[in-house]
Curated annotation (Swiss-Prot):
One family name in Pfam for this protein: MoCF_biosynth
CDD domains according to UniProt: cinA (cd00885)
HAMAP family: CinA_B
Name this protein carries in UniProt: CinA-like protein
S-S pairs: none
InterPro entries per the UniProt record, alphabetical: CinA (IPR050101), CinA-like_C (IPR036653), Competence-induced_CinA (IPR008135), MoaB/Mog-like_dom_sf (IPR036425), MoaB/Mog_dom (IPR001453)
Signal peptide location: none
Matches recorded under Gene3D superfamilies: MoaB/Mog-like domain
Similarity section: Belongs to the CinA family.
Amino acid sequence: MLKVEMLSTGDEVLHGQIVDTNAAWLADFFFHQGLPLSRRNTVGDNLDDLVTILRERSQHADVLIVNGGLGPTSDDLSALAAATAKGKGLVLHEAWLKEMERYFHERGRVMAPSNRKQAELPASAEFINNPVGTACGFAVQLNRCLMFFTPGVPSEFKVMVEHEILPRLRERFSLPQPPVCLRLTTFGRSESDLAQSLDTLQLPPGVTMGYRSSMPIIELKLTGPASEQQAMEKLWLDVKRVAGQSVIFEGTEGLPAQISRELQNRQFSLTLSEQFTGGLLALQLSRAGAPLLACEVVPSQEETLAQTAHWITERRANHFAGLALAVSGFENEHLNFALATPDGTFALRVRFSTTRYSLAIRQEVCAMMALNMLRRWLNGQDIASEHGWIEVVESMTLSV
């Protein structure tokens, strides 16, 4: 199997001052192309360290994706490190220099002298175009390893990987068939509870079951070779059966996006009233393009379940909305949810059975509970669902 590695560069990445989202994205993207990463390394802005690790990995990896260090400043050292590792000098790429000058001219700016550095590449390097920025990429062969050097800006990095690097890999290597990966996301059951129920299932050869916990959800993932796809799809039916009503969506699209599409398909507008969640519902749904008619965040106040239900019923009528959803304030470990629909208003009062989670996590959980309540109504299910540490203590329905 092709041995593919990644090297992230930069003091800010090494010291944890920024999250290395490029590494996470590349690992996931390459995995789904049949190119799982075998190793990831991070090195700061130090020329000797960069040269050392380039020479070291050139003896072990078939492909190395180097990210960052192609900018115009003194701490951008990737091109010089590559040239030094090969025992070569840097040469000016005249065509890219002219492209950069055009880039700045079209934007009414004068290119700074320091940008000239971005057109200096190791001698004999293969130029890689950057259609969305000033940092071109390049490729060099060092010992057994084909190395690709890419910009650190995420939008530029992703374009270069997808449109420049992956096609080159497909031309030069015989790539394996991408694996099959089936995913679903659950809400309300613990990871250990799910694992206890699912670990009894017999997996086909080469197939693995994975769990990823990210409060307030747990993702289940069945991964295996394409040759086992039929067996995996049959097993997937058992996985969904065992996970039961805790399943909130399949795939990677996310619950807000799926709710947004369902609202649009059924021509429902939605109005929101939030206290404890502080606008989190509005943020998630607006980012997914949901048909939001009106959103408000109001100061937290103690309310009975009946008060919350009547308030959101009136709000739906006043805004001529298809649906209206409310999350009350959080008082004495209790919280109200209410959903006003054409069929009536459905409300729940819940109690948190633990206090060990932070405010941010509790808000995320409550936002997910509200979204799940909406999802269940749209699917024709009862709005209440089980949750490991949240208990429904009261429910009510207001008829139309």
